[in-house]
Curated annotation (Swiss-Prot):
One of its GO terms (biological process) is terpenoid biosynthetic process. Keywords: 4Fe-4S, Iron, Iron-sulfur, Isoprene biosynthesis, Metal-binding, Oxidoreductase. It comes from Chlamydia abortus (strain DSM 27085 / S26/3). Pathway: Isoprenoid biosynthesis; isopentenyl diphosphate biosynthesis via DXP pathway; isopentenyl diphosphate from 1-deoxy-D-xylulose 5-phosphate: step 5/6. This is 4-hydroxy-3-methylbut-2-en-1-yl diphosphate synthase (flavodoxin). PANTHER family: 4-HYDROXY-3-METHYLBUT-2-EN-1-YL DIPHOSPHATE SYNTHASE, 4-HYDROXY-3-METHYLBUT-2-EN-1-YL DIPHOSPHATE SYNTHASE (FERREDOXIN), CHLOROPLASTIC. Its EC number is 1.17.7.3. GO terms for molecular function: 4 iron, 4 sulfur cluster binding; 4-hydroxy-3-methylbut-2-en-1-yl diphosphate synthase activity (ferredoxin); 4-hydroxy-3-methylbut-2-enyl-diphosphate synthase activity (flavodoxin); iron ion binding. Binds 1 [4Fe-4S] cluster. Its cofactor is [4Fe-4S] cluster.
Amino acid sequence: MIHPPAQKQAARRYTHSVKIGNLYVGSDHSIKTQSMTTTPTADVDATVAQICALVEARCEIARVTVQGIKEAQACEHIKERLIALGIDVPLVADIHFFPQAAMHVADFVDKVRINPGNFVDKRNMFTGKIYTDKHYADSLLRLEEKFSPLVEKCKRLGKAMRIGVNHGSLSERVMQRYGDTIEGMVVSALEYIEVCEKLGYRDVVFSMKSSNPKVMVAAYRQLAKDLDARGWHYPLHLGVTEAGMGMDGIIKSSVGIGTLLTEGLGDTIRCSLTGCPTQEIPVCESLLKHTTTYLNLPRKNNPFALENSESFVNASKKITKTTPWGSVYGVFIKLNEDHMLNTPVEQLLEQLGIHPENGKKDFTTPDGVVVPKSFIGTSVLKKLEQHFIVFHHHEVPCLYDYNHEIWNQEEVLSSPFVHFHASPPFIHSTRDFFEKKQGEQQPVKLVFSKDLDDECEAAVAIATEFGALLLDGLGEAVILDLPNIPLSTVREIAFGTLQSAGVRLVKTEYISCPGCGRTLFDLPEVTKRIHERTQHLVGLKIAVMGCIVNGPGEMADADFGFVGSKTGMVDLYVKHTCVKAHIPMEQAEDELVLLLKEHGVWKDPE
């Protein structure tokens, strides 16, 4: 085994180079952005046009869905057209359920993506089937027999492969033995790479996707650890599957992808946003921009990494003091002089989530605000105090590093909480602080200040750095100081990050796929309408999936599912069970509401 030079271990996990078309991925190369077309692959003109648009948007790898032989044959013409147009972008075929299509399309594309959950084995259908040790061993032999021809062909042709594990579509065999766990995801990946290793084929990239960033981060961390322990340095493609629409999708993707990038993991990335695929690329670029600081630093082990695949609860934090904001993770927004002087107080309250007519709080109203000391005693402050916990920075101790002597001063010990102002790099310095203070019981508010003007960049920055710490279980509250971002957007980012990290649920969560050539309805429009009708159902998870491939499997965490079954038809799910099939699209949204009522989770909007 040839070990990488010492300097290569600085920021990124060492990975060997994999050639995809005329492009290389691995730790010797820049992190690549990629996306997937939403056009029917058999429509060569439309697919080529969308790939050209993606390349214009600076997408570096383009993927298309290949359901069968017709789509595989179309890939030959797509590749020819791209070459004729001078478009040198690697073309990737996405395969589910149909190994014959993979064998056929490998002649025409640069990389083949397969899903271990459905390439050879059956996807888990929750039948309760029991696999004996002999059945399991026989299944592994069958896996090797069915998978080896594709491996040998890709090796012979110099084509790359992605082994893409999805949390929601583990095979029946793996689910029966390991359950719906991180261990099951890792085993699923390792079973396939062992066949590749046996045949001397190493042009492989891995992905370990989930719609839950917490699961996704834990799975990638565990796979990287297990691969490195074996001396296998395969590149990783990062993504949160079915992240959703708009700001919610950006935040959820950033919590997962951003956390891993700051830890040196990841060689290619994709933000799976519902809508036009070109919109994904600026988010990917923003993620890479905001994690550059960490990639230029010596790589550090995370003392709070989620090592245990059975538990996502970090035990290092044991806070016994009661906080003024209660048992939830607190959200505080810093107000500046412009807010206090130039915004009418009723308008300011509305921007903070207070209904102007009845004074009711929105689901994303912060727990409190931080104000300049000069406004103590003013009429504006008195209005704010009717709705929020209000304080100024000098009322509580402000710490910039952990110092045992300072921590044990009476001023700190007697305070209901302390503020921690992290120095750059925010994640590393905060982890250092909490590692040193383990055992101390004082609640800590993390202070997050960013001088950003762009709302997307602000969302990416906060969701990446604050989200990583939430996944570690650090802190009891956050103060967000984003003076150039509208207060309503600051609230959306704060609570969206908490929700994506699974720390504080304040709204309905939507698991919606980005769409591809398999999509059977107008995914963005239908998702938008369902959101409008159900957004008041706090804590509920609803999946809106374009087809049966990404439907029953990828909505692993959803309570209810709205899944395209055939053209113009929708199936409705409760958890993993289809309860209403082939509903005409024009009736399906009303039927979803009826289903929610039947299960006692519906309430009329206020």
